[in-house]
Amino acid sequence: MSPVESSNVEKDIFRDTPVRFLGKRYANEVGEAFRSLVKPVVVKFSYVVAFGYVAADSVDKGFKESKKPHANDTEKAKRVAIIAVDTVLWQTFASVLIPGFTINRFCFFTNMLLEKSTKLPTNLRKWTVTALGLATIPFIVHPIDAFVEDAMNKTARKVYNY
């Protein structure tokens, strides 16, 4: 995209700005990283926050689409539904399920490795796992986003012609 084209494209606050990193989009990954140190209800709440982010982005995208001109009300309703569903799917996989699973398994196996190969005290081991889990989050973002984008282009988006 040329600089002129990119300046005409509206910035998506839910995908293209630091809002993603302010505890909303990645709330559940942070919850997963802290799993060994907090009560299960805290981890569950982190998923509530993450799904709240998914809902907010979906409503935002649907609302913006509803404000655009359409040939008729039927076409408008169809486009709004497609945009909202596409956003729910993309955000659920790219922001909640895949990253949450990735950090959960990373922390689980890191804990196992440290438990078997070191003599770290339990509390230090748990904090080390949490720190490593948190440090991993920035490295998984873009590969997961690209994977989900590609997977959706090859599957769901073909179904609803997005």
Curated annotation (Swiss-Prot):
Where in or outside the cell is it found? Answer: Mitochondrion inner membrane
The similarity comment for this entry is:
Belongs to the MTFP1 family.
Q: Which UniProt keywords apply?
A: Apoptosis, Membrane, Mitochondrion, Mitochondrion inner membrane, Transmembrane, Transmembrane helix
Topology versus the membrane? Multi-pass membrane protein
What residue range is the signal peptide? none
Which GO terms are recorded in the biological process aspect for this UniProt protein? Answer: apoptotic process; mitochondrial fission
Record field: transmembrane: 36-56, 81-101, 128-148
Q: What is this protein called?
A: Mitochondrial fission process protein 1
Q: Which Pfam families match?
A: MTP18
What this chain does, per the entry, is described as:
Involved in the mitochondrial division probably by regulating membrane fission. Loss-of-function leads to apoptosis.
Q: Which domain of life is it from?
A: Eukaryota
Q: Which GO cellular component terms are attached?
A: mitochondrial inner membrane; mitochondrion
Q: Which InterPro entries match?
A: Mitochondrial_18_kDa_protein
